[in-house]
Amino acid sequence: MAFRKNKKLNNDFTKVTISLASPESILEGSHGEVTQPETINYRTYKPEMGGLFCERIFGPVKDWECHCGKYKRIRYKGIICDRCGVEVTEKKVRRERMGHIELVVPVAHIWYFRSLPNKIGYMLGLPTKKLDQIIYYERYVVIQSGVKSEDGINYLDFLTEDEYLDILDKLPRENQLLDDKDPNKFIAKMGADALETLLSRLNLDELSYSLRHAAANDTSQQRKAEALKRLKVVEAFRDARSRIENKPEWMIIRMVPVIPPELRPLVPLDGGRFATSDLNDLYRRVIIRNNRLKRLIEIKAPEVILRNEKRMLQEAVDSLFDNSRKINAVRAEGNRALKSLSDMLKGKQGRFRQNLLGKRVDYSGRSVIVVGPELKMHECGLPKDMAAELFKPFIIRKLIERGIVKTVKSAKKIVDRKDPVVWDILENVLKGHPILLNRAPTLHRLGIQAFQPKLIEGKAIQLHPLVCTAFNADFDGDQMAVHVPLGHEAILEASLLMIASHNILNPANGAPITVPSQDMVLGLYYVTKGRKSTPEHPIKGEGMAFYGAEEVVIAINEGRLSQHAHIKVKGIVRTDAGELVEQMIDTVAGRVLFNLVVPEEVGFVNELLTKKKLQLIIGMVFKIAGMSKTAKFLDDIKQIGFQMAFRGGLSIGLDNIGIPADKNTLIDGAKKEVDSVWSNYLMGLITDNERYNQVIDIWTRVNSEITDTLMKQLEADQQGFNPIYMMMHSGARGSREQIRQLGGMRGLMAKPQKNLQGSVGEIIENPILSNFKEGLDVIEYFISTHGARKGLADTALKTADAGYLTRRLVDVAQDAIINEQDCGTLRGLTVSALKDNDDIVEPLTERILGRVSVHDVFHIISNELLVSSGQEITEEIARSIDDSGIESVEIRSVLTCESRRGCCAKCYGRNLSSGQMVGIGESVGVIAAQSIGEPGTQLTLRTFHVGGTASNITVDANIKAKFDGVVAFDDLRVIQSTNLEGDKVTVVMGRSGEIRIVEPVSGKTLLSNHVPYGAFLNVKDGETVKKGQELCFWDPYNAVILSEFEGTIQFDSIEEGVTYREESDEQTGHREKVIVDTKDKTKNPAIIVNHKKGEPKGYSIPVGAHLAVEDGQDVKPGQVLVKIPRSVGKTRDITGGLPRVTELFEARNPSNPAVVSEIDGIVTYGAIKRGNREIFIESKDGVKKRYMVPLSKHILVQDNDFIRSGNPLTDGAITPSDILSIKGPTAVQEYLVNEIQEVYRLQGVKINDKHIEIIVRQMMQKVQIIEAGDTSFLTNQAVDRFKFREENDNILDKKVVVECGDSEKLRPGMIITARQLRDENSSLKRKDQRLVVVRDAEPAVSMPTLQGITQASLDTESFISAASFQETTKVLSEAAVRGKVDFLKGLKENVIVGHLIPAGTGQRVFNDIIVGSKEEYDSLIASKEAFNAARKGELQQS
């Protein structure tokens, strides 16, 4: 037993290795064997000797005092008492000393046979069920068949007890006396003992070789897969051998380590009871069973009893290691499963997440916050009592320094008495000592900021109103925590990096986040809003001209000039070119007051200030005037805002809300329209679904008309000085939606529905016609309650989802740090303005701003250089690129960055929170995760303000010309037909057709639109059209299938009750045939049109379609055969948004994926097999692909259509993995970025692309091996792409030995260099022996993969980071088998081991830097030079 006196862990280790513990290493770390199950003596409360709390093994219970009390005091330090054998030392050693239990029989470790992949099972090639039979002593297993091999008994055969005894009887006597190594001896065992023997006899290299051979050459796919699974485990052990000794037989336990007693305490409660850790119970069971087994073996008990006891011991050890894995877990009272060692690590309450990643912090306090409007940007108010407590040690030190007290104890008394001298000292201590304020939940880095404290009376912390947005704080009872940075570095970082006045921009999008809100905005809006004189309300001083701002202020103060008067004043204006010019300005008197605080280099701001305008102005001030002036500017506008809101006395009255006069006429009109839709329906002209959709559309339209009227009316009221209108228009409070409900009508509400996703809200078709001013009647109120409650319930549920998303994002991106200036890649992303139809969603300037260009970009016409390659695109450059008419620019992106670890500064571009290029060491991954996760919580909290009203999106059902020009058709198959009224119409039959509008002169395509199947054309090819003219229209509510020619209808497999059901409308009595899903897969409903002249043509019909024709009916070309109702008019709620974001980040396949074409080609329909329709696509070069499409899906292509690769054949969403395999990595990356952005855009949340790019980059780090070649990879293994490249480069130009000839060094299958081959062959040649035959080594082949963020986090290089994320036991057991080394490169693993994170000021580059003054350095250099010169002189003399 090793005795380590001072095992202090040195804290500058650079890597952590995990491996299996050998019995020897457990013994070495142990301080003694625990032999008794007793814990403590119930009378003396002293630990029992040899028990689980024994002092001899684990150390004394009291400092410097042995068990029997013979030695007390520190002077006997290190002595081992001769009476009780306890070492006299500190009691804290009971936290670190381990013990052990020596087991009589080995047991298997539950992690390695219960969790998948089953390590022991794969090593031996045994299935889990059979393995259990061995481990739990049900069967014998043959380890060596020996002489019995001729009787057909083979290695790894299973024997029942009878068979085993039978064989033993027939064996020759002397066989059992042979040595185990003798190949003739018959050996069969059971239990973990057998496994240990089997594992120790394995030859890993041979096993690996034979498995690789099987995986490469086996014909059966299943055996191939099996071999690969086994190879994974075998290779893991072989891989570990290169670093550390790691034997397979160590998965079997002979020694059980006993963790230190202080980590599993036993605490006496009052009333003579004890509270104990569950581990003590589990250990006790192991010891009791082990001792009983020992005794049974000594008294030579029968085999049956021994076997039972051995099995119980195995189960006891299983429960100790992992109790949650077992089916019959050991339970305490109240049927609660005991917490085993594994459970101590797992989950939110486990060691990793509870104690290593989130610790409680000393020097902290928390209190309620109140607003502090007179504070400066960098200040906060700290209650005196809190400050005195937080800074106690500092005060005590000063008290002793000043000689006021002599001892710490008396100083403490003074501080606790709160003597007046304490406040004096405290003022001094606080100078230049910032504190950190934090509001939970901390969703992004602005949730913790530093402030300079000001002492205040009272008990609440005062917070600056402008930082509330960043903290997401309000003053309705929020609490905040205060922390004190102690070290010099900490104080420096707090006051330079975290101080509130430096965090003006939001890292998510680079827009200012410290923007005035509520009262401040209202005040600023009010003061900068002008009004004209009217006879009843003359405005003082209207039309006056002033020489300067001071005159205006005097006039206002004297009461000669109203703040709202329109006046002329001389001021300095900033031109577009950025020069400041003096000129006369037409403005409003109040705006002059505002401009007094605007920094002069910005020029005169002549705007009506709303919240959005203020954000832009603050952004502009930040760019032009810099950070410190912006902070002062913010404080000033806060002052004006509050001041003016108070002066204006703005408040709401009931009369401020007017109800539009023509509300009732509009509603009556709508009711009439709805009635006519109903009568159409009752006559059977439209389906129920169409009726529903039309009714919803009517109400949506009327609602917005009423809202528009209401807004116009409010705006006209008192020249726009209606308080409610001002609040809404300025952005201070309230939205258009809310005002609509106050004065218009509440509108359509969502129907209660039982779907959790909330992706589609069906709408109740009777809207609420009243508004809140008129009051709702009972039924309207009742309908409203559902929406309101749903909003609140959603909020509660979604917050958790968003939080979990953030956690996964942080975990996947935590090691993305800027590690180098330039990775030197030549690749980039081509970006252009994002358009939705023709509305620009995001202009090119915004997408390229702050990025680095890949190439030189020249002006199209003048050919001047706009930006050179590798240069950051600033605001000016972006504007000039936009003005030059360049459509797209190739920019550097983290998606194409070639850095081995993290990414490089050039590919990342600008750091959004400072507006400068990003610095090395910035942890961009965490910033990205926070930027995406933080609005996620916002999105979820968006639903309940509007009170559950349904926002509806009306659908387009036509294409209008956006420009004047000439129409050109592309691939457009059309057919002439007549509609229901008998008029001639042109119907589109193809699905890939496009209408283009071409400029008549240059022939340039101005716009190209896809035309849906079944649309009616209003124009002809080559026709000239005007802007706004309708080109075509279609039925927005139904997708249709049309007949292509004249003929007679014949139904195929359309049988009532089997493939369709008659739905009769209760109201109309009309009966409709609706196709349903049938169990009988041979029945495939189709409509066949029998052509008068040619071939008949069949149309297969998807489930849910409505038939529009009868059997035997005559049809014309272009007539509708089938209507498939489109689900339109569904409300989009961000509830649908959050699961969508999750789905994209997890790279999950959507529930009904589309079948996608992999090649360009012509479509042909095949036969129908097993309920699937075959579709063939043949490309021009003769490649033919076959797709099986379920008949229940709607097929989007017709026979003989031309389809492009990556286009869907059926309806449904395209899966990301399809995009990856067909269009490649770049396409899938862009798809993910755009789709995720789309969800956030709908909510009006701006997130910069680069954040999402970083996460997507992390999802695409791995490649999948298709062919392993001669590398060490396995087929289907996921490998880091850089590792893959390295391994392939490594094997390049190497040779593989095919035949070794007469060489003694080389074996077949060895990989050697050309040099080794040359040397070996030349030496063989000299001896006239057979030469070595070789072939070139084959590199591995891989394909890019897309991993979900959870999978990517678990596959990270660092096992510590992965284990602290999810599936802790699985990650750790895998890592132990592999003997993994964690080099502590990411942030998370460093936090866990207690190091500084390798980012920012904690970069490892700074570790060895010595900080000194310039003078010292110069003097050192000078003296070194002088010394060298003197030395030189001496040498010359000698």
From Swiss-Prot:
Q: What class of enzyme is it?
A: transferase
Q: Which GO terms describe its molecular function?
A: DNA binding; DNA-directed RNA polymerase activity; magnesium ion binding; zinc ion binding
Query: Where in the chain are disulfide-linked cysteines found?
Result: none
Q: What does this protein do?
A: DNA-dependent RNA polymerase catalyzes the transcription of DNA into RNA using the four ribonucleoside triphosphates as substrates.
Q: Which NCBIfam families match?
A: rpoC_TIGR (TIGR02386)
Q: Which GO terms describe its cellular component?
A: DNA-directed RNA polymerase complex
- The reply to whether NADP figures as a keyword in the UniProt entry is no
Task: Recite the UniProt cofactor note for this protein.
Answer: Binds 1 Mg(2+) ion per subunit.
Any idea which positions bind Zn(2+) 1?
Answer: C66, C68, C81, C84
The cofactors named for this UniProt entry are: Mg(2+); Zn(2+)
GO BP terms: namely: DNA-templated transcription
Q: Where does Mg(2+) bind?
A: D474, D476, D478
Subunit details = The RNAP catalytic core consists of 2 alpha, 1 beta, 1 beta' and 1 omega subunit. When a sigma factor is associated with the core the holoenzyme is formed, which can initiate transcription.
User: What family does the entry list?
Assistant: Belongs to the RNA polymerase beta' chain family.
Identify the residues that bind Zn(2+) 2: C823, C897, C904, C907
UniProt-listed InterPro entries: DNA-dir_RpoC_beta_prime (IPR045867), DNA-dir_RpoC_beta_prime_bact (IPR012754), RNA_pol_asu (IPR000722), RNA_pol_N (IPR006592), RNA_pol_Rpb1_1 (IPR007080), RNA_pol_Rpb1_3 (IPR007066), RNA_pol_Rpb1_3_sf (IPR042102), RNA_pol_Rpb1_4 (IPR007083)
Enumerate the UniProt keywords alphabetically: DNA-directed RNA polymerase, Magnesium, Metal-binding, Nucleotidyltransferase, Transcription, Transferase, Zinc
Task: Give the reactions, separated by semicolons, that this protein catalyses.
Answer: RNA(n) + a ribonucleoside 5'-triphosphate = RNA(n+1) + diphosphate
Record's keyword annotation contains Zinc? yes
What's the superkingdom here?
A: Bacteria
**Protein name from the UniProt record:** DNA-directed RNA polymerase subunit beta'
